[in-house]
Amino acid sequence: MLSRLFQCRRLRFSQRVGRRVLSLLVLMGLPLAAQAEGFDNLSSLADKGFIIGAQAQLLGSGESLGALDPTRRLSPASVTKLYTAAASLDRWGPQHRFTTQLMATGDVDAQGVLHGDLVLDGGGDPALTSENLWRLVQRLRERGVRAVDGQLVVSQWRFGPVTCVTTDRCKARTRSDNAYSALLSSAAVNYGSWCNRVKPGSAVGGEASISDCATVAPLTRLDNEVKTVAHGGDTRLSAERISSESGDTLRVSGQIARDSFSREIYRASSDPAEQTAKTLMALLEQAGIEVESYATSTTPPPTTAKRLAAVDGKPLQELLLRMLNYSNNFMADTLALDLVAKPRAELQDAGDALMRFAQELPGHGVPTLASGSGLTPENRVSARDLNALLAAMYQRSALFPTFVAGLQLPTNGPMHFIRRGSDTFQQQVMLKTGTLNEPVTVRAVAGYFRTQTGRWGSFAVLVNGTSQTPYLAWRQVLPLVAADLTEMIKSR
């Protein structure tokens, strides 16, 4: 009995010494790739050639629970959005709203005719929708405006069109089969994407019906190759937006069952400011306000222009919830561009603003950030950098509730692919993931956790491939991270 008691005490002593040695190594900044204490499962990926940086710590005390090459800077992919969210909260606070306004370059006469241009001043709202534009039009009617003898001008003077720096966005200038590559403008609406609704036709074998989600009448040319099939049939749709000198064309093919509900299709537009102009022109026409033509502009409204109507967007806290939960690239890059003070901002200006914010955080090194979304593969941060960011936001009592609310719990978050690992991991970890497949594989995850005794911790894991490594699915990575974090959570 005494021998067993002695062995237990010796084991506990060895564990305490091991943890102290690990903490000392971390404080000294020594690499821990060879001693992956706390990340034993994750470190197995190194045997397959993947480059890994990881660190987990208790907040408040700063005690390290595990580290694996924590100072190595790697691509974080969409985990970059944590910097965008933090910098936005630091700049504006949770209740900030972006304002979009309609301005007049002339006067409105007694008959309701505006003698001049009607200017939409894009305020950089990352979630401006057709509904917001409809409200602007209704407020314009309330002011008695019935016609404009000039033209509608959509001003994107703050930023836009933003130079593309990633392959997907550069391709989107001519064609797009997705919405995540949407181009950027301070006057963009509906996340820079066309939304069209596909409904079954009136008879089997006939053409399906396609309409704009907001204005009903299509705002682009349509190449409709969707057929209506019998009740109970499969619904399969494929859509691509193609652009030419004459504008955007949406090519939709496939089939939709006669008893199917309508399906919505989102595809990035080739010119977000022009998309806004076309949408607003249609809404003005529906409201009975006559405008003959439209134009887009990169100059501010004249200083003599008068405000006729304005609409405030959703509070920043709601924007961040959507941006982080759904990893919305358009919203993230728009918010990062909003951080730039000068007009005609480009993505690198936004990256510079984020880097300045990051370098002011205690314990943070010098990152490389070329965008706020993480779409740019040049972005580089370390696991220690991310933990410094997470620790700094944890200390900001007025901002932390909004910041952490944007992270997902695997057990009930909107993204189902993270529902892996133990119940402890799924219910006690709040995280943001990042994924890139080109030019190399990136799987990154960072966030917070609660220990068994209720203490808060933070963690960051960066896994980057090389040209020689195989494809890496989340189902291969997340269970390893979950197993390691589960042990840490249970140990405290």
Predicted regions and their residues:
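N-terminal secretory signal peptides that target proteins for export/translocation
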Residues: 1-16
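Bacterial N-terminal signal peptides
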Residues: 21-31
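Beta-lactamase-like hydrolase cores
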Residues: 34-76, 99, 134-143
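Conserved serine DD-peptidase/penicillin-binding transpeptidase domain
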Residues: 39-42, 91-364, 483-492
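Short glycine-rich loop/turn motifs
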Residues: 51-54, 320, 332, 443-446
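Small-residue-rich helix-loop
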Residues: 65-67, 336-492
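A short glycine/serine-rich beta->alpha loop
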Residues: 68-74, 266-267, 373-376
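Active/ligand-binding-proximal structured segments within catalytic/core domains
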Residues: 75-88
